[in-house]
Amino acid sequence: KGDPAEWMRDACYGEDTLEVSTAIAVGVVVAQPDYPYSKATQKEVIDIPIYGVTSKNRRFIAPQSVKMATMPDMDDDELVEREMWATAGDYLCVVTGTGRSIKQAAERAYKVVDDLHISDMIYRDDIGEKIEDELPTLQEHGYATECEYE
């Protein structure tokens, strides 16, 4: 939490001002075919508009192969051109959700993924599910003891 530059400066002077969140985070990779194999040509994966990025959900999206470009968009019933995100490769972004539990964090991440509209976008829809079965074993060994699935 806070400004990383400030807590790094404080650390240089022997002060520990780093505040760490105890929230659980889940990240969902949003890509285009044929990620992760990267056999698609640049022509096939660049300059595709990324719709649905808003000032509200932008802070949960870490852009990767993304650029700003003038793209077609609808304004009421009129076709207009505006500056927006467009694809610049096949690994587009990581959408992050945080919460008190793994399930809540995943639900929040997928809510933002659902806001995005990208032609042929692909993503896994099972992020965080496997840990439901594995978490008790990890906790028996002393790991993730404060973590909850639901």
Regions found by a protein language model. Name each.
Residues V28-V29, Y91-G99:
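Short, well-ordered beta-strand elements within core beta-sheets of diverse protein domains
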Residues A5-R9, A106, Y110, G128:
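Predominant activation on well-ordered alpha-helical scaffold segments within soluble catalytic domains
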Residues K1-P63:
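Active-site "cap" helix and flanking loop/linker of ATP-utilizing ligase/carboxylase catalytic domains
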Residues K39-V94:
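Generic long, charged, amphipathic alpha-helical segments
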Residues I127-E150:
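A cross-kingdom feature marking charged/low-complexity
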Residues T22-A25, G89-Y91, Y123:
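A generic structural signal for well-ordered coil/turn residues at beta-strand boundaries
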Residues G97-L116:
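Short, well-ordered alpha-helical segments
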Residues E81-E83, K111-I127:
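Short arginine-rich
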